[in-house]
Amino acid sequence: MVRLEQSIASSGTSLYTLMHRAGRFLAYEAKKYLEQKSDYRGPECNRTKNGESEWSKTNHNEPEHGKTTSGQNQFRAITPNQLHTATLTQLYVSILCGHGNNGGDGWVAADYLAKAGYHVDLISSVSAQEIKAEPAHTTACEIEHDIKCEIEHETERKITASPKNNQTIHLLINPTNEEVEASLSKADLIIDAILGTGFSGDAVREPFATWIELANQQKAREKVNEKILSTDHPAFNTRNARIIAADVASGFSAQTGTAANPCIVADHTVTMITLKTGLVQPSAKTYCGTIRVAPLANFDL
Protein backbone atom coordinates (compact mmCIF):
# COMPACT_ATOMS: atom_id res chain seq x y z
CA MET A 1 0.00 0.00 0.00
CA VAL A 2 2.85 2.37 0.85
CA ARG A 3 4.55 1.59 -2.46
CA LEU A 4 1.29 2.23 -4.32
CA GLU A 5 0.85 5.61 -2.63
CA GLN A 6 4.46 6.51 -3.44
CA SER A 7 3.91 5.51 -7.06
CA ILE A 8 0.85 7.75 -7.28
CA ALA A 9 2.78 10.58 -5.64
CA SER A 10 5.67 10.20 -8.09
CA SER A 11 3.20 10.50 -10.97
CA GLY A 12 2.24 13.98 -9.78
CA THR A 13 -0.51 13.49 -7.19
CA SER A 14 0.88 14.38 -3.77
CA LEU A 15 0.12 12.44 -0.59
CA TYR A 16 -1.39 15.67 0.75
CA THR A 17 -3.87 15.71 -2.13
CA LEU A 18 -4.61 12.00 -1.67
CA MET A 19 -5.43 12.63 1.99
CA HIS A 20 -7.85 15.41 1.09
CA ARG A 21 -9.50 13.15 -1.48
CA ALA A 22 -9.76 10.34 1.06
CA GLY A 23 -11.27 12.59 3.71
CA ARG A 24 -13.68 14.08 1.20
CA PHE A 25 -14.87 10.66 0.05
CA LEU A 26 -15.24 9.55 3.67
CA ALA A 27 -17.38 12.62 4.38
CA TYR A 28 -19.40 11.96 1.23
CA GLU A 29 -20.26 8.44 2.40
CA ALA A 30 -21.06 9.74 5.88
CA LYS A 31 -23.30 12.44 4.45
CA LYS A 32 -25.27 9.89 2.41
CA TYR A 33 -26.08 7.96 5.57
CA LEU A 34 -26.99 11.10 7.53
CA GLU A 35 -29.34 12.21 4.75
CA GLN A 36 -31.10 8.86 4.90
CA LYS A 37 -31.39 9.06 8.67
CA SER A 38 -32.96 12.49 8.82
CA ASP A 39 -36.35 13.44 7.40
CA TYR A 40 -34.79 16.84 6.77
CA ARG A 41 -32.08 16.63 4.10
CA GLY A 42 -30.76 20.15 4.52
CA PRO A 43 -30.50 23.10 2.17
CA GLU A 44 -27.08 21.95 1.07
CA CYS A 45 -28.60 19.00 -0.78
CA ASN A 46 -31.67 20.62 -2.33
CA ARG A 47 -32.64 19.19 -5.69
CA THR A 48 -32.64 21.22 -8.86
CA LYS A 49 -35.48 21.05 -11.40
CA ASN A 50 -33.86 18.17 -13.25
CA GLY A 51 -33.37 16.21 -10.03
CA GLU A 52 -29.64 16.87 -9.77
CA SER A 53 -28.42 17.63 -6.28
CA GLU A 54 -26.68 20.89 -5.48
CA TRP A 55 -23.83 18.77 -4.06
CA SER A 56 -23.19 17.28 -7.49
CA LYS A 57 -22.96 20.79 -8.96
CA THR A 58 -20.49 22.08 -6.38
CA ASN A 59 -16.91 22.84 -7.39
CA HIS A 60 -14.67 20.11 -5.97
CA ASN A 61 -11.27 21.33 -7.09
CA GLU A 62 -8.38 19.93 -5.09
CA PRO A 63 -6.90 22.20 -2.38
CA GLU A 64 -3.43 23.54 -3.00
CA HIS A 65 -0.77 22.45 -0.54
CA GLY A 66 -0.60 24.93 2.30
CA LYS A 67 -4.18 26.10 1.80
CA THR A 68 -7.26 25.00 3.71
CA THR A 69 -10.60 24.07 2.25
CA SER A 70 -12.16 27.41 3.23
CA GLY A 71 -14.12 28.78 0.31
CA GLN A 72 -13.30 25.86 -1.95
CA ASN A 73 -13.51 22.09 -2.23
CA GLN A 74 -16.37 21.86 0.23
CA PHE A 75 -20.02 20.97 0.42
CA ARG A 76 -22.34 23.74 -0.72
CA ALA A 77 -22.40 26.39 2.01
CA ILE A 78 -25.49 26.78 4.17
CA THR A 79 -26.40 30.43 4.57
CA PRO A 80 -27.37 31.85 7.98
CA ASN A 81 -30.89 32.50 6.71
CA GLN A 82 -31.29 28.91 5.58
CA LEU A 83 -30.14 27.60 8.94
CA HIS A 84 -32.45 30.02 10.71
CA THR A 85 -35.60 29.17 8.75
CA ALA A 86 -35.13 25.44 8.24
CA THR A 87 -36.42 22.91 10.75
CA LEU A 88 -33.06 21.21 10.90
CA THR A 89 -32.91 17.93 12.77
CA GLN A 90 -29.71 18.23 14.80
CA LEU A 91 -27.40 15.48 13.61
CA TYR A 92 -24.20 14.70 15.49
CA VAL A 93 -21.05 13.06 14.18
CA SER A 94 -18.25 11.83 16.44
CA ILE A 95 -14.94 11.20 14.70
CA LEU A 96 -12.29 9.12 16.48
CA CYS A 97 -8.84 10.05 15.16
CA GLY A 98 -5.52 8.34 15.69
CA HIS A 99 -2.22 10.18 15.35
CA GLY A 100 -1.24 8.70 11.99
CA ASN A 101 -2.39 9.35 8.44
CA ASN A 102 -5.60 7.40 9.02
CA GLY A 103 -6.41 10.03 11.62
CA GLY A 104 -5.59 12.69 9.03
CA ASP A 105 -8.41 11.35 6.86
CA GLY A 106 -10.68 11.86 9.86
CA TRP A 107 -9.60 15.49 10.28
CA VAL A 108 -10.42 16.21 6.64
CA ALA A 109 -13.81 14.47 6.90
CA ALA A 110 -14.58 16.53 10.01
CA ASP A 111 -13.83 19.73 8.11
CA TYR A 112 -16.21 18.83 5.27
CA LEU A 113 -19.02 17.61 7.51
CA ALA A 114 -18.85 20.70 9.71
CA LYS A 115 -19.03 22.91 6.64
CA ALA A 116 -22.08 20.91 5.54
CA GLY A 117 -23.82 21.97 8.74
CA TYR A 118 -23.48 18.91 10.94
CA HIS A 119 -22.39 19.02 14.58
CA VAL A 120 -18.96 17.41 14.66
CA ASP A 121 -16.92 16.21 17.62
CA LEU A 122 -13.33 15.43 16.64
CA ILE A 123 -11.70 13.22 19.25
CA SER A 124 -7.91 12.95 19.17
CA SER A 125 -5.36 11.69 21.69
CA VAL A 126 -2.94 14.45 20.62
CA SER A 127 -3.13 17.98 19.28
CA ALA A 128 -2.51 18.69 15.61
CA GLN A 129 0.97 19.98 16.42
CA GLU A 130 1.85 16.69 18.11
CA ILE A 131 0.96 14.55 15.10
CA LYS A 132 4.21 13.31 13.58
CA ALA A 133 3.00 11.55 10.44
CA GLU A 134 2.85 13.51 7.20
CA PRO A 135 0.71 14.73 5.56
CA ALA A 136 -1.58 14.27 8.60
CA HIS A 137 0.43 16.81 10.62
CA THR A 138 0.18 19.57 8.01
CA THR A 139 -3.47 18.86 7.25
CA ALA A 140 -4.57 18.76 10.89
CA CYS A 141 -2.64 21.94 11.74
CA GLU A 142 -4.39 23.81 8.93
CA ILE A 143 -7.82 22.64 10.05
CA GLU A 144 -7.10 23.31 13.72
CA HIS A 145 -5.91 26.81 12.82
CA ASP A 146 -9.17 27.47 10.97
CA ILE A 147 -11.18 26.22 13.94
CA LYS A 148 -9.36 28.55 16.34
CA CYS A 149 -9.73 31.51 13.97
CA GLU A 150 -13.47 30.83 13.68
CA ILE A 151 -13.86 30.69 17.47
CA GLU A 152 -11.86 33.90 17.95
CA HIS A 153 -13.82 35.66 15.20
CA GLU A 154 -17.16 34.73 16.72
CA THR A 155 -15.95 35.75 20.19
CA GLU A 156 -14.84 39.16 18.95
CA ARG A 157 -18.22 39.75 17.32
CA LYS A 158 -19.95 38.36 20.43
CA ILE A 159 -22.39 36.34 18.36
CA THR A 160 -23.88 33.74 20.65
CA ALA A 161 -27.41 33.20 19.36
CA SER A 162 -27.33 33.98 15.65
CA PRO A 163 -26.89 31.14 13.17
CA LYS A 164 -23.42 30.80 11.67
CA ASN A 165 -22.45 30.39 8.05
CA ASN A 166 -20.74 27.11 8.89
CA GLN A 167 -20.75 24.88 11.93
CA THR A 168 -17.43 24.62 13.69
CA ILE A 169 -15.71 21.49 14.95
CA HIS A 170 -15.69 20.70 18.65
CA LEU A 171 -12.19 19.46 19.42
CA LEU A 172 -11.67 16.92 22.21
CA ILE A 173 -7.91 16.58 22.66
CA ASN A 174 -6.69 13.82 25.00
CA PRO A 175 -10.18 13.54 26.51
CA THR A 176 -11.21 11.48 29.51
CA ASN A 177 -13.07 8.25 28.89
CA GLU A 178 -16.18 9.94 30.27
CA GLU A 179 -15.89 12.72 27.68
CA VAL A 180 -15.48 10.21 24.87
CA GLU A 181 -18.48 8.22 26.07
CA ALA A 182 -20.60 11.39 26.30
CA SER A 183 -19.72 12.33 22.72
CA LEU A 184 -20.41 8.87 21.32
CA SER A 185 -23.69 8.50 23.19
CA LYS A 186 -25.17 11.53 21.41
CA ALA A 187 -23.76 10.65 17.99
CA ASP A 188 -25.92 9.73 15.01
CA LEU A 189 -22.80 8.56 13.23
CA ILE A 190 -19.36 7.49 14.47
CA ILE A 191 -16.40 7.65 12.11
CA ASP A 192 -13.50 5.38 12.99
CA ALA A 193 -10.22 6.92 11.83
CA ILE A 194 -8.00 5.52 14.58
CA LEU A 195 -5.82 2.79 13.07
CA GLY A 196 -5.17 2.20 9.40
CA THR A 197 -3.67 -0.43 7.14
CA GLY A 198 -0.34 -0.34 8.95
CA PHE A 199 -1.79 -1.91 12.09
CA SER A 200 -0.75 -5.42 13.06
CA GLY A 201 -0.85 -7.39 16.28
CA ASP A 202 -3.35 -9.01 18.58
CA ALA A 203 -3.98 -6.09 20.94
CA VAL A 204 -4.77 -2.38 20.67
CA ARG A 205 -3.06 0.10 22.98
CA GLU A 206 -4.77 2.67 25.16
CA PRO A 207 -6.50 5.03 24.85
CA PHE A 208 -7.64 3.54 21.55
CA ALA A 209 -8.70 0.21 23.06
CA THR A 210 -11.19 1.99 25.32
CA TRP A 211 -12.41 4.21 22.46
CA ILE A 212 -13.11 1.12 20.36
CA GLU A 213 -15.00 -0.56 23.20
CA LEU A 214 -17.09 2.57 23.81
CA ALA A 215 -17.92 2.87 20.11
CA ASN A 216 -18.95 -0.78 19.94
CA GLN A 217 -21.19 -0.27 22.96
CA GLN A 218 -23.29 2.11 20.88
CA LYS A 219 -23.78 -0.73 18.40
CA ALA A 220 -24.91 -2.96 21.24
CA ARG A 221 -27.51 -0.36 22.23
CA GLU A 222 -28.80 -0.40 18.66
CA LYS A 223 -29.40 -4.15 18.92
CA VAL A 224 -31.31 -3.57 22.16
CA ASN A 225 -33.49 -1.00 20.38
CA GLU A 226 -34.53 -3.58 17.81
CA LYS A 227 -36.10 -5.62 20.61
CA ILE A 228 -37.78 -2.67 22.36
CA LEU A 229 -41.21 -1.60 21.17
CA SER A 230 -41.57 1.48 23.39
CA THR A 231 -39.30 4.51 23.03
CA ASP A 232 -40.05 5.26 26.69
CA HIS A 233 -38.01 2.25 27.73
CA PRO A 234 -34.93 3.40 29.75
CA ALA A 235 -32.61 1.34 27.54
CA PHE A 236 -33.87 2.92 24.32
CA ASN A 237 -31.21 4.94 22.45
CA THR A 238 -32.81 7.39 20.03
CA ARG A 239 -29.57 7.95 18.11
CA ASN A 240 -28.95 4.44 16.77
CA ALA A 241 -25.40 5.36 15.81
CA ARG A 242 -23.78 3.60 12.87
CA ILE A 243 -20.02 3.24 12.48
CA ILE A 244 -18.13 4.05 9.29
CA ALA A 245 -14.46 3.05 9.23
CA ALA A 246 -11.75 4.85 7.27
CA ASP A 247 -9.73 2.39 5.16
CA VAL A 248 -10.15 -0.52 7.59
CA ALA A 249 -11.84 -1.13 10.93
CA SER A 250 -9.42 -0.22 13.72
CA GLY A 251 -7.89 -3.38 15.14
CA PHE A 252 -8.48 -5.36 11.95
CA SER A 253 -5.46 -6.44 9.92
CA ALA A 254 -5.68 -5.29 6.32
CA GLN A 255 -3.00 -7.86 5.46
CA THR A 256 -4.25 -11.04 7.17
CA GLY A 257 -7.92 -10.45 7.96
CA THR A 258 -7.44 -11.18 11.66
CA ALA A 259 -8.99 -9.04 14.38
CA ALA A 260 -7.20 -7.79 17.47
CA ASN A 261 -8.81 -7.37 20.86
CA PRO A 262 -10.69 -5.08 20.80
CA CYS A 263 -11.65 -4.39 17.20
CA ILE A 264 -14.16 -1.92 15.78
CA VAL A 265 -17.33 -3.54 14.46
CA ALA A 266 -18.17 -1.20 11.58
CA ASP A 267 -21.32 -1.07 9.49
CA HIS A 268 -19.47 0.30 6.49
CA THR A 269 -15.83 0.74 5.50
CA VAL A 270 -14.48 3.21 2.97
CA THR A 271 -11.16 1.76 1.88
CA MET A 272 -8.77 3.90 -0.12
CA ILE A 273 -7.46 3.25 -3.65
CA THR A 274 -7.70 -0.55 -3.71
CA LEU A 275 -9.17 -3.52 -1.86
CA LYS A 276 -6.69 -4.92 0.64
CA THR A 277 -6.02 -8.64 1.09
CA GLY A 278 -7.55 -8.80 4.55
CA LEU A 279 -10.75 -7.16 3.37
CA VAL A 280 -11.63 -10.09 1.11
CA GLN A 281 -11.36 -12.61 3.97
CA PRO A 282 -14.63 -13.99 5.45
CA SER A 283 -13.91 -12.25 8.77
CA ALA A 284 -14.01 -8.83 7.09
CA LYS A 285 -17.79 -8.83 6.89
CA THR A 286 -18.03 -9.13 10.67
CA TYR A 287 -15.72 -6.23 11.46
CA CYS A 288 -15.78 -4.02 8.36
CA GLY A 289 -19.39 -4.42 7.22
CA THR A 290 -20.06 -3.37 3.65
CA ILE A 291 -16.96 -2.14 1.86
CA ARG A 292 -16.60 0.56 -0.76
CA VAL A 293 -13.35 1.36 -2.55
CA ALA A 294 -12.58 5.05 -2.98
CA PRO A 295 -10.72 5.36 -6.32
CA LEU A 296 -8.52 8.22 -5.18
CA ALA A 297 -6.07 8.01 -8.06
CA ASN A 298 -8.85 9.08 -10.44
CA PHE A 299 -11.41 10.75 -8.24
CA ASP A 300 -14.47 12.59 -9.43
CA LEU A 301 -17.76 12.88 -7.54
Question: Residue spans of the language-model regions?
Answer:
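Alpha-helical scaffold segments in soluble metabolic enzymes
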Residues: 3, 21, 25, 29, ...
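YjeF_N-associated NAD(P)HX repair module
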Residues: 2-3, 187-301
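Anionic-ligand anchoring segments at beta-strand to alpha-helix junctions in alpha/beta enzyme folds, i.e.
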Residues: 25-28, 90-144, 156, 165-177, ...
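Active-site catalytic pocket residues across diverse enzymes, especially alpha/beta-hydrolases
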Residues: 34, 113, 117, 219
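Intrinsically disordered, low-complexity repeat/linker tracts enriched for polar/charged residues
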Residues: 40-41, 45, 50, 55, ...
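An N-terminal, well-structured beta->alpha segment
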Residues: 1-39, 90-91
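Electropositive phosphate-/nucleotide-binding environments in soluble metabolic enzymes
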Residues: 12, 16, 20-24, 107, ...
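Short glycine/serine/threonine-biased micro-segments
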Residues: 21, 96-101, 194-196, 249
